[in-house]
Curated annotation (Swiss-Prot):
It is found in: Cytoplasm. This is Proteasome subunit alpha. Gene3D superfamilies: Glutamine Phosphoribosylpyrophosphate, subunit 1, domain 1. It comes from the Archaea. It comes from Thermococcus gammatolerans (strain DSM 15229 / JCM 11827 / EJ3). SUPFAM superfamilies: N-terminal nucleophile aminohydrolases (Ntn hydrolases) (SSF56235).
Length: 260
């Protein structure tokens, strides 16, 4: 007779809590997000920017066909991490809810309303049998009266952030945000900070591996940076990183000189 671990029942059943109060399947969904491509968002007073890692696994893939920032409405976009097929289902649902709201009320859906609806759907998939949690987290960003940036968790929880990252590079990117983000950051600074945080999580950052989009309060319409614009920002950032590394090495040598 095969040995069955004590936690096996809680491990397989989505609706059953373990004795220490956990839903194992929700934890596993979070693990899928932690292994996913990194996505970051940065907010400034006049708008918000999203930047996402594009994992091009073959040189035969057309990079332009690999979309990682999804437009929900004119004023709202989402960047996923985790199981992208799950994320597409959430994106399609968000687009539907945005259309229903616009047809019903004759105005764009507030981002907070849309985030709550998506998180209600996520939460329902942790409570009923016959389904599993969505193995995807979304960064949802947009503007109504002000710029907003939310992280949605597989459990259905959501949080508003000034700057945030999800995916495998979360810890590295969040450390950079903690060090460099300020409330008076401008659009140029926010875009550069988002690309910097993403570049630090990549072994070989390139314009093909980074997708960037932003929205401003003035225009209230998402715009994606083309490859040339991403390359310009990335080259500036990589130059700054090299200069910092040179300065650090010079400091190390000056400390050695003092010991002689």
């Amino acid at each position: 007779m095969a040995f069955v671990p004590p936690q096996a029942g809680y491990d397989r059943a989505i609706t059953v809590f373990s004795p220490d109060g956990r839903l194992f399947q929700v934890n596993y969904a979070r693990e899928a997000v932690k292994r996913g491509a990194t996505a970051v968002g940065v907010k400034w007073k006049g708008g918000v920017v999203l930047a996402v890692e594009k994992r091009i696994t073959s040189r035969l893939i057309e990079p332009s066909s690999y979309e990682k920032i999804f437009q929900i409405d004119d004023h709202i976009a989402a960047a996923p991490s985790g199981i992208i097929a799950d994320a597409r289902v959430l994106v399609d649902r968000a687009r539907l809810e945005a259309q229903i709201y616009r047809l019903t009320y004759g105005e764009p859906v507030p981002l907070t309303v849309l985030v709550k609806k998506i998180c209600d759907l996520k939460q329902a998939h942790t409570q009923y049998g016959g389904v599993r949690p969505f193995g995807a987290a979304l960064l949802m960003a947009g503007v109504n009266e002000k710029p907003e940036l939310y992280e949605t968790d597989p459990s259905g929880a959501y949080f508003e952030w000034k700057a945030v990252a999800i995916g495998s590079g979360r810890n590295t990117a969040m450390a950079i945000f903690e060090e460099h983000y300020s409330d008076d950051i401008d659009m140029e600074g926010a875009i550069k900070l988002a690309i910097l945080a993403l570049a630090k999580t990549l072994e070989e950052p390139s314009p093909e591996s980074i997708e960037v989009a932003y929205i401003t309060l003035d225009e209230k319409r998402w715009k994606k940076l083309d490859k040339e614009e991403v390359a310009k920002y990335l080259n500036e950032i990589l130059e700054e990183i090299k200069e910092e590394e040179v300065e650090e090495r010079e400091e190390d040598y000056s400390e050695l000189d003092q010991n002689y």
